[in-house]
Amino acid sequence: MRRVAALLAAAALVAGIAGCGGGGAEPGAPRGATLVLDFQPNAVHSGIYAAQANGDFRDAGLNLRIQEPSSTADSAKLLETGRADFAVMDVNDFGIARERGLDLVAIAAIVQRPLASVIARNPGEIRTPADLAGKNIGVTGVPSDDAVLDTVLRSGGVDPSSVHRVTIGFNAVADLAAGQVDAATAFWNAEGVELQRKGIPVREFRVDQFGAPRYPELVVAVARRNCSEAGALLDGLRKGYAALTLDPRAALGDLLDQVTGLDRGSQEAQLAALESARAFVPADGGAASPALAPEDGRAWLGWATRRGLVKRSSAARIAAGFGASGGCR
């Protein structure tokens, strides 16, 4: 009995030691982490899913879980409360979160140029932004829509107050197809592609071709307190984007394999549009890359302050959130 008791005590001691720290994880084992997306998975996220499929995040020390958001407001909240480690955010949402006082840092770019546009039906009638004067234009109700629309209108010498804005939510495809509006703010890589696939003639006015600078539409953000974890995520992303460059169709296949319910034809068309626009390639050229140049973030900030999306008094606070790729500062 005494021997049995001693063995049981020793076993309990070993179990207690093993249970202390790291939740029982073995030394050197990948650390669990969560990346929240900006929207439901789609072709724009192909580099992320390629890295996940190839084990690049695990090799970098992360057991990464990719999480879909329940709303576009999720990302900042989850980072703020510590319920997510990383988040893909629209750069406009990132800037507004910084303005609100959240200490987030942008460490990578998922795409390297704006995806926002004004899409018009009846391209025979609407050839330039000047032709939008007096038209009914749909907006989602998101603040950045007004900044995008005003920029495109002003590029054609149109007074923004001369158009009739209609809040249509995220129904641009249906409302443009039905002729409910003459034009709408929408993403050219998503709604623009779907309209073309439906055979509806449209004209796109991409915001960086009509008055806005080139800036990264989507960034990866981290709470500054978690900056030490950024390097591992970036290592995985770089390899994922290298795979995307080497074989885009295989990267898209990784997305489709991991996310059920996506339409292959739609996603192939979206990826083709992104590649044609070199949306994954930094402004200085080269191959697809998640590298985020701080000056690209500042280019967005200059435009956003001019259009009233964020206050000029918040510019310094927001600018401090655009850290160089590879680390936080």
Where are these regions (language model features)?
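Conserved C-terminal helix/tail region of periplasmic/extracytoplasmic solute-binding proteins
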Residues: 297-329
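Surface-exposed patches in mature extracellular/periplasmic domains of secreted proteins
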Residues: 106, 164-165, 244-255, 313-316
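Pocket-lining segment of extracytoplasmic ligand-binding domains
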Residues: 92, 171-263
